[in-house]
C-alpha cells in the first residue's frame, strides 16, 4: 500500500490539483483491509468531465501500485462543515447509506439541523460532510476527528446518533468504516 500512497502524494495529487477546475483532493486508507479512497473535487461538472482523459492513467497506475482495481463514483457535495482543520494523525469515520431518492432532501435537512450540531459536541471532532448520489438514492457521510483515539472514544455516541438519525431520515446503513486521513487538501466551501 505504501508504494501506491507515495505515488498518489508525489505524482497523482499534484497533477490533478493542477488541472483547471480542481478544488482539492483527499485520501484516506485503512491499512488493515487495504481499502483506499481518493477523492477529487471540481468547481463544476464540466470541469470534472474535462479532466477524465488525463486522470485515467493516473488512476490506473495508482490501482496497480495499491494492488486493486479502482472504481469511480460521482457524488454531489451536499453539505460540508469544518469545526477546525484536520492535521497529521486525523482519522475519518465514513457511513454509506441508501434510501428513496425522493427522501434525500429530508435526510440532508436532518444532517444539517440534527447530526452536525450533535457531532460538534463530540470530543476531537474536526469536520463533517455529506455526499449524495440523487439518481441512486445513495449517500455517504464522513466525519473527521483529531486522532484515532478520539475517533474510537466517540464510537458509541456516533453509533447511537447514526441509528437515530438514519431511522428518522428513512435510510438504510450500507457500511461504516474507519480510515486514517492521509491527505486533506479540499478547498470546497463551507456548506452548512
Residue ranges and their predicted role:
Residues 1-36, 43-192:
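Short S/T/G/P-rich N-terminal loop/turn motif that feeds into the first structured element of a domain
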Amino acid at each position: 500500500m505504501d508504494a501506491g500512497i507515495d505515488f498518489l502524494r508525489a505524482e497523482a495529487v499534484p497533477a490533478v490539483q493542477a488541472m483547471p477546475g480542481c478544488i482539492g483532493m483527499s485520501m484516506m486508507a485503512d491499512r488493515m483491509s487495504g481499502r483506499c479512497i481518493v477523492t477529487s473535487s471540481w468547481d463544476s461538472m464540466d470541469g470534472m468531465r474535462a479532466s477524465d482523459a488525463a486522470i485515467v492513467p493516473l488512476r490506473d497506475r495508482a490501482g496497480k501500485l495499491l494492488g486493486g482495481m479502482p472504481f469511480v463514483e460521482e457524488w454531489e457535495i451536499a453539505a460540508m462543515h469544518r469545526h477546525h482543520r484536520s492535521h497529521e494523525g486525523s482519522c475519518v469515520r465514513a457511513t454509506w447509506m441508501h434510501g428513496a431518492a425522493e427522501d434525500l432532501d429530508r435526510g440532508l435537512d436532518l444532517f444539517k439541523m440534527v447530526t452536525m450540531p450533535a457531532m460538534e459536541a463530540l470530543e476531537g471532532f474536526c469536520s463533517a460532510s455529506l455526499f449524495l448520489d440523487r439518481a441512486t438514492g445513495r449517500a455517504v457521510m464522513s466525519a473527521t476527528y483529531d486522532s484515532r483515539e478520539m475517533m474510537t472514544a466517540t464510537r458509541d455516541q456516533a453509533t447511537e446518533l447514526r441509528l437515530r438519525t438514519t431511522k428518522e431520515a428513512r435510510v438504510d446503513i450500507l457500511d461504516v468504516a474507519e480510515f486514517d486521513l492521509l491527505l486533506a487538501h479540499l478547498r470546497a466551501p463551507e456548506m452548512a
